[in-house]
Design a protein with these regions (language model features):
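Short, electropositive alpha-helical surface patch
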Residues: 144-155
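C-terminal helix-cap and adjacent tail motif
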Residues: 5-12, 155-184
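Structural motif
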Residues: 90-92, 129, 155-157
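Short, basic/glycine-rich phosphate-binding loops at helix/coil junctions
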Residues: 6, 90-97
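Small-aliphatic-rich amphipathic alpha-helix that forms the alpha element of a beta-alpha
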Residues: 33, 93, 99-144
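N-terminal amphipathic, basic helical "cap/leader" segment at the start of enzyme domains
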Residues: 1-88, 183-184
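A generic structural signal for short coil/turn motifs at secondary-structure boundaries
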Residues: 16, 102-106, 169
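Short, well-ordered beta-strand micro-motif
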Residues: 49-51, 94, 161
């Protein structure tokens, strides 16, 4: 697949089949992440792959509760039995880095760069992905992180779901680049 087609075709997927992501597919996706640019060549990312449906449900349930507490205007939307966090995806990936205040911003950016590589590779393989920003609220719930296998010295930087899309995603329109000014 051409890079331009991959970049423009990838969409956030929120509906998945029950078909599992194979180990080979997941390894290819993770390897793509390790080829991302990284500050000072540190490659700070570590990955936790969760396929256990009960743990994924725990993540969804705990995250919904935290969103309702942290953002009252969203409380009604998050008071549902429908999984509007992990969307019943078969796999949840936690990109984690060490808790290090000096490197926190760099670690976050490195994790985001690695994740974009993984998203593009997943799309190339016919898989769908979606960034789960609200799941980061679980960084304030050490008991949940322990259940997910996140060591105490690490924090989640980018959680995302991955699986086989239920349907083909439509192409959305994007705005033209918003260039403030060209400086010559």
């Amino acid at each position: 697949m051409e890079l331009d087609a991959c970049i423009k075709g990838r969409r956030s997927v929120r509906a998945y089949t029950d078909e599992p992501v194979s180990k080979e597919q997941m390894e290819a996706v993770l390897e793509a992440g390790t080829w991302a640019p990284t500050g000072m060549g540190r490659e700070p990312w570590q990955f936790i792959i969760i396929k256990d449906k009960n743990l994924i449900k725990l993540v969804s349930d705990e995250t919904k509760q935290l969103v309702k507490q942290a953002m009252p205007p969203l409380a009604e939307r998050f008071s549902t039995d429908v999984d509007i966090i992990c969307y019943n995806a078969p796999t949840l990936v936690l990109v984690c880095t060490e808790k290090d205040p000096q490197w926190a911003n760099v670690n976050l950016l490195d994790s985001v760069l690695a994740t974009e590589n993984m998203f593009l590779k997943a799309y190339e393989l016919g898989l769908g992905t979606c960034y789960m920003g609200f799941v980061q609220l679980l960084n304030n719930k050490p008991e949940v992180l322990r259940n997910l296998g996140v060591p105490e010295n690490l924090e989640m930087t980018v959680p995302f779901i991955i699986g086989h899309p239920k349907s083909k995603q439509g192409r959305g329109e994007r705005q033209k680049p918003n260039v403030l000014k060209w400086i010559k």
